[in-house]
Swiss-Prot record:
Pathway given in the UniProt record: Pyrimidine metabolism; CTP biosynthesis via de novo pathway; UDP from UMP (UMPK route): step 1/1
Gene: pyrH
Class of enzymatic activity (EC top level): transferase
Activity regulation info: Inhibited by UTP.
CDD domains: AAK_UMPK-PyrH-Ec
EC number from the UniProt entry: 2.7.4.22
Family the UniProt entry places it in: Belongs to the UMP kinase family.
Protein name: Uridylate kinase
Catalytic activity: UMP + ATP = UDP + ADP
Organism for this UniProt entry: Acidothermus cellulolyticus (strain ATCC 43068 / DSM 8971 / 11B)
């Protein structure tokens, strides 16, 4: 279903409670650089404030960050570099973004851990899902870096896989636009935004907000996705409060199912 207009989202309704207990937030690396190479401190600070506000409400949060503001393996390989090697360069870029976000969160008093799929003990813990869950249960934000630690897999796929393994209830896919459109709204003024999409419709239409592997993984395991505009302050809170912003990708009628957040056996 499409509504044709983005519109500005209102502030979260006063007195409401979050509808999700544990979420995974996917951030594109390009957003960290504000369209440029490197990290824009103002943007990262804004993201950190939004995350801190949600964590203060008791929501358990994990984050996956891309590295497109530094390197993009698939693009480097087109220029003649070995694909696997260029993907590893991209993974290192994601870790730089993780450390930047960690720094801004810690400055706000939010206890944070970075876990990476490639061992780098001086700056991060190794990725251990049970440990990540324990951190979140203690109110810490866990930031996952270095993708899946293997070439040929995107950070979108990483987000889907990590969300499933840590028992998240939803993937919050943050973008620079307010949802999924039938064409690029930056070049087509008549582009129509979808309120809800089924996984199979996303794949059939070849909509490019995430790669097919990530969408298939979410579809096969019933993991809902909310695609929303991160650049509007407060939208992360609106998403976890269940407000209808952006585009919901799920099966059924557009209401994300409440997946059960899980904890490891004690």
């Amino acid at each position: 279903m499409a509504d044709g207009e983005g519109g500005a989202a209102s502030a979260p309704t006063a007195g409401t409670r979050p509808v999700y207990r544990r979420v995974l937030l996917k951030l594109g690396g390009e957003m960290f650089g504000g369209g440029h190479v490197g990290v824009d401190p103002d943007i990262v600070a804004s993201i950190a404030r939004q995350i801190a506000a949600v964590v203060a409400e008791g929501v358990q949060m994990a984050v996956v960050i891309g590295g497109g503001n530094f390197f993009r393996g698939a693009e480097l390989s087109v220029r003649g570099m070995d694909r696997a090697r260029s993907d590893y360069m991209g993974m290192l870029g994601t870790v730089m973004n993780c450390l930047a976000l960690q720094d801004f969160l810690e400055k706000l008093g939010v206890d944070t851990r970075v876990q990476t799929a490639i061992t780098m003990g001086q700056v991060a813990e190794p990725y251990i899902p049970r440990r990540a869950i324990r951190h979140m249960e203690k109110g810490r934000v866990v930031i996952f870096g270095a993708g899946l630690g293997a070439p040929y897999f995107s950070t979108d796929t990483t987000a889907a896989q990590r969300a499933l393994e840590i028992g998240a209830e939803v993937v919050l896919m943050a973008k620079a636009v307010d949802g999924v459109y039938d064409s690029d709204p930056k070049t087509n003024a008549d582009a129509v935004r979808f309120d809800h999409l089924d996984y199979d419709e996303v794949l059939a239409r070849d909509l490019k907000f995430a790669d097919a592997t990530a969408i298939s993984l979410c579809r096969d395991n019933g993991m809902p996705i909310i695609v929303f505009n991160l650049l509007e302050e407060g939208n992360i809170a609106r998403a976890v409060h269940g407000e209808k912003i952006g585009t919901i990708v799920s099966s059924g009628d557009g209401v994300p199912p409440r997946r059960q957040a899980v904890s490891p056996a004690r």
